[in-house]
Each structure stands twice: as structure tokens, then as C-alpha cells.
Amino acid sequence: MRSLILSLALAVAGISTALADPPSFRAGVTRMTVQDATPFDVLIAYPTKAAEVSIEEGPFRFSASRDAPVAAGARFPVVLFSHGGGRPPGTPLGHGDLLLHLAREGFIVIAPFHPGTERPFVDRPRQIHKALDSVLADPRFSNRADPDRIGMMGFSFGGAVTLIVAGANIDLAHLSAYCHDHADDSRACEGIATDGSWAKVPPSRKFDDALPLKTLVLLEPYGAPFERKGLGSLDLPMLIYSASQSDLRPDGNALALAKALPRPPQQAAVPGSHFVFIDPCSPVLAARAPEVCSDPLGTERAAIHQRFRQEIADFLRANL
């Protein structure tokens, strides 16, 4: 029933969007380096009128206009994005299909390349904040980005980062207890102490630089570090996606979040494994990262992306 309701809601959003006849843009893309304890790059996708060309970044291929001017007109809403972690390490380039689609739909997307760190729950939210500040201060974007309309998306560990940036508190004692009881959830529990040493670790306090986000989209989110009390401040519209054949247990992650949030989120499931939210792979990437690029029999990753990228664009437009 919930899936039916979501489908109808998204269909209505699509009709409303069509009636509004939003302007058609092409995708611009650029990078900047942000200074931090470990400097990091930020990928920015944005609306432009310049022609797109084929671009290769390592094993990733996409169409965009590199370093083109931002389209003129009204200010554009901003969408922050946090990629996954773990092995293999994540990158926003693995989500270029989605990020560039949002740029063509009239959003400015800010996506840091999170460097490796021993404190990802602390460092990645800070990197998101620094990336946003740097883009809003950049003369190319300062009068084109709307600082009053900011949303955020995250995939896998990036889903946890998204929740923290929105004001959620992590609870390592809760995470440790979950992993003690659910050792089979290896994607959620790798490296997590289950010997009782985390039992008295207090929940984190609210992230000092929590942003006034208007809406969130979570793709296969890492939800095990959160419990109901730590999510109590997140009373905002949210869309949560899960993969039907994921090895990240939904009852401890995506579904657990949906039950614990103060406002019931919209939920959607797609066929495939955890990495189905990564773009369809080039032959080079498939050879380098077969786990990321392999899908269960019958999974049509390209068709799934075509569906959810428009659903996400419609959801963000309705809430930003």
C-alpha cells in the first residue's frame, strides 16, 4: 500500500511539474578544492545553457559542459550530496547520472570527494559544511544559488552523514548493541566493537554546524547508528530508497529509520543490490570493481536510474 501511495504521490508531483513547464537546462560541471585539515575536491553540477560534450574522469563517463557559465535567471535551489564509504571507496562520480540530471532540472548540486578519515562521523559533516560555504562564496555561484532552499541527499554511509548534517545524533552504544545481535549485517557492522566497550559511550551531541535543510533523500542509508531519540529533531519531508536484494539489512537501516523518524517518510524500493544506486558501469569500472557493477539476474540498472532520478527531482522540486 505504501508503495502504491508513493507511486501516486510521485505521479501527481510529475503532473504538477509538467503543468509548471520548468525551463530546460543542460548540465554544467566544475571542480574546486576546499582547504581543510586534509584538502578535498568538490564536484559541482549546475544548470547551464552551454552545449554538453562527452567527458571521461577515470573509469567514469558522462555528458556535461565543463566550467560553463551558470544559467541566468532566478536563483536555483541547492542540493548537497554525500557519497558512500567503505570498500571500494565512494566517489560522487559514481552518481553522475543522478547529479547531472538534477542540474538539468534546475538544481545546483554540491558533492564533496570525502577523503579517508578515522573520524568519518565528525569529518564528513564538516566537509559538507565547508563545501557549501565555499560554493556560496564563489563568484560563479554566489548570486545563482539560493541559500534559503537547501536539501541534501546521501548514499549508504552518506545517508548517515546527511542525517547528522540535518541535526541527528549518532548513538555508538546503540550501534554496538545492534551489531552484537546482528552480526550478519556485515556491511553495517564492519569494524564495530561488540565486546561491550562501547556500551557506555553517550550519544553524540547535535552537530555544531547543523544546516537548516528543507528536505532529505536517502539512498540505501546506513541507519544502524541512530535510534529514535537521536532523530527527534528531524521533522522534515524525507524520501528513503532501499534495494530489495541488498546486503545492508533494511530492518536495521532504511526501515528502522522510517519507523523511528518523527515524521513518516515517503519510501520506495527498487530491484537489485546495495550498489544498484551507482551509475551503470563502464567496462573499465566493471573490471576494477565487479562487486559494485554486478547486479542480480533480471536487474535493469539503467532503467532503474531513469525512474528514480526523475522521482527524486520531482520530490526535491516539491519540497525546495
What do these predicted regions represent?
Residues 283-320:
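Catalytic active-site module of serine/aspartate enzymes centered on a nucleophile-bearing elbow/loop
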Residues 224-225, 244-249, 275:
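Acidic catalytic loop of the alpha/beta-hydrolase fold
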Residues 236, 247-260:
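Short alpha-helix in the alpha/beta-hydrolase fold that links the catalytic acid
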Residues 234, 240-242:
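Short beta-strand/loop motif that positions the catalytic acidic residue
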Residues 118-151, 160-164, 173-189, 193, ...:
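Alpha/beta-hydrolase active-site loop
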Residues 21-79:
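Domain-level recognition of soluble alpha/beta enzyme cores
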